[in-house]
Amino acid sequence: MSNSVPVIAVDAMGGDHGPSIVVPGAVRAARENSLKLILVGDKDAISAELNRLPLDGVAYDIVHASQVAGMEEKPSDILRRKKDASVQVACRLVRSGDADGIVSAGNSGATVACGMFIMGRIPGVERPALASVMPTEKKPCVLLDVGANVDCKPYHLFQFGLMAEAFARDLLEIETPRVGLLSIGEEEGKGNSQVKEAYELLREAKNINFVGNIEGCDLFTGNVDVAVCDGFVGNVALKLSEGLASSLARLLKRELLTGIKAKIGTFLARDAFRRFARFVDYAEYGGAPLLGLQGIAIVCHGASNEKAIASAVGMAGTFVSKGTYHHLVETISANEELTSYGKAVKQ
């Protein structure tokens, strides 16, 4: 779009709580960032939520959508039978140029499918992929893919690395992000056949700081800025880290509230605990960007709270302002020859 202010289409009906969480979260993002909202969904339900909120300085439009993509519905059914579903309408706004990006906490499979078939893919990209931001001892690390593609060929992993590197440049504000390939050992020859072939492609990539193989423990050390893997491995790693963080938090809380000395120590260290809680809070980033589409798309968890929605909408606006989509296009185009070579190699 030519408009200098990012315009973000928000699927107001998505998520476990629909407009009651999504609308306040989106409005919060619009107040905290320079962007315009297009709230997509049931007009009456959206208006009812807006009437409860302070809207001074908030630029927004409402686009009515009569249908909702159910969380348990098949993405293919939603694409074929629910043309007026809020997520479909939001994606069409991006395709038509009326919006720069979409944010949805609804059916993630439907969001991915609608993004691919309505918004379309960046020329040369075969598999759009979901990125997740992982907290580390230093700066965050971008993990890609975390669930959009469970079966991948080597050149898919190669393209994931290209897209994640361009994305990390804007997100982490690092000129040359360090890109690692997740494997079972750091040595060059480690990994299955797909990983080994992807290694060779990434090593030859233009303008990519490829540091070689990394292991699972490297996800949290901060020694790489980008970790590349297929969606099966990435989703397992993501859910494992989320589960571990939740379990450790519960264990820590239980131990810190046992006995008067522990309670006093907890009180004295409360600021440190608050910083740690923010550090591991998924709501700080809000959602997983779906990279490889012709536009910005952020997929949020169905259980997202207001803060998570606000973070996701704000992130979408930031990526529009920074030209992240164009950076992805440039990176993919610069490595088109290697991608073609990877496709030609017998899989």
UniProtKB/Swiss-Prot annotation:
Q: Which GO terms describe its molecular function?
A: phosphate:acyl-[acyl carrier protein] acyltransferase activity
One GO cellular component term: cytoplasm
Q: What are the EC numbers?
A: 2.3.1.274
What coarse category fits the chief subcellular location reported for this protein?
cytoplasm
Q: Which Pfam families match?
A: FA_synthesis
Q: Which UniProt keywords apply?
A: Cytoplasm, Lipid biosynthesis, Lipid metabolism, Phospholipid biosynthesis, Phospholipid metabolism, Transferase
Biological process (GO), any one: phospholipid biosynthetic process
On the tree of life, the source organism's domain of life is Bacteria
Family classification: Belongs to the PlsX family.
Explain the purpose of this protein: Catalyzes the reversible formation of acyl-phosphate (acyl-PO(4)) from acyl-[acyl-carrier-protein] (acyl-ACP). This enzyme utilizes acyl-ACP as fatty acyl donor, but not acyl-CoA.
Assembly and interaction partners: Homodimer. Probably interacts with PlsY.
User: This protein is called what?
Assistant: Phosphate acyltransferase
Organism encoding this protein: Oleidesulfovibrio alaskensis (strain ATCC BAA-1058 / DSM 17464 / G20) (Desulfovibrio alaskensis)
